[in-house]
Amino acid sequence: MSAKDERAREILRGFKLNWMNLRDAETGKILWQGTEDLSVPGVEHEARVPKKILKCKAVSRELNFSSAEQMEKFRLEQKVYFKGQCLEEWFFEFGFVIPNSTNTWQSLIEAAPESQMMPASVLTGNVIIETKFFDDDLLVSTSRVRLFYV
């Protein structure tokens, strides 16, 4: 195992996504929240989110995470897949993570134009969000969450 692989394993071992919520960015109202560690690789996670989230112009995502390890440039790359085809890609950067810290990170996710939106009945169960967790260019973990609109 290379030093990079070992470093990625160390970071992942000490990393935990404690909770996450999604809010309507305009009203601040929480639409969904969960405490499952959605960063765990190797399993397909599931999230049941309300259909009305698709009507929001923007969604505010709040992540609370703990890290035993220091990270120089913690960042996420996310891809939204519909039936295996990538529809959207997002990039988020947190930056420096203090070792043995718990942090809350808020990000704004802008919705696709309404003309490009598919109905919840078509999307439900067919959307997977793939999240890659990085420390700068070092891939730490890849997780997948299947969305169900309820």
Swiss-Prot record:
Localisation per UniProt entry: Cytoplasm, Cytosol; Cytoplasmic vesicle membrane; Cytoplasm, Cytoskeleton, Cilium basal body
Coiled-coil segments on the chain, per record: none
Keywords for the protein's UniProt record, in alphabetical order: Cell projection, cGMP, Cytoplasm, Cytoplasmic vesicle, Cytoskeleton, Membrane, Sensory transduction, Vision
Ranges where the record places region Required for association with membranes: 144-150
InterPro entries in UniProt: Ig_E-set, PDED_dom, PDED_dom_sf, Rhodop-sen_GMP-Pdiesterase_dsu
GO terms, molecular function: GTPase inhibitor activity
Tissue: Detected in retina photoreceptor cells, especially in rods (at protein level). Detected in retina, brain and adrenal gland.
Main location group: cytoplasm
Gene3D superfamilies in the cross-refs: GMP phosphodiesterase, delta subunit
Membrane topology label: Peripheral membrane protein
GO annotation, cellular component aspect: cytoplasm; cytoplasmic vesicle; cytoplasmic vesicle membrane; cytoskeleton; cytosol; photoreceptor outer segment membrane
Gene Ontology biological-process entries: visual perception
Family: Belongs to the PDE6D/unc-119 family.
Subunit and partners: Interacts with the prenylated catalytic subunits of PDE6, an oligomer composed of two catalytic chains (PDE6A and PDE6B) and two inhibitory chains (gamma); has no effect on enzyme activity but promotes the release of the prenylated enzyme from cell membrane. Interacts with prenylated GRK1 and GRK7. Interacts with prenylated INPP5E. Interacts with prenylated Ras family members, including HRAS, KRAS, NRAS, RAP2A, RAP2C and RHEB. Interacts with RAB13 (prenylated form); dissociates RAB13 from membranes.
Biological role: Promotes the release of prenylated target proteins from cellular membranes. Modulates the activity of prenylated or palmitoylated Ras family members by regulating their subcellular location. Required for normal ciliary targeting of farnesylated target proteins, such as INPP5E. Modulates the subcellular location of target proteins by acting as a GTP specific dissociation inhibitor (GDI). Required for RAB28 localization to the cone cell outer segments in the retina. Increases the affinity of ARL3 for GTP by several orders of magnitude.
Name the UniProt record assigns to this protein: Retinal rod rhodopsin-sensitive cGMP 3',5'-cyclic phosphodiesterase subunit delta
Underlying gene: PDE6D
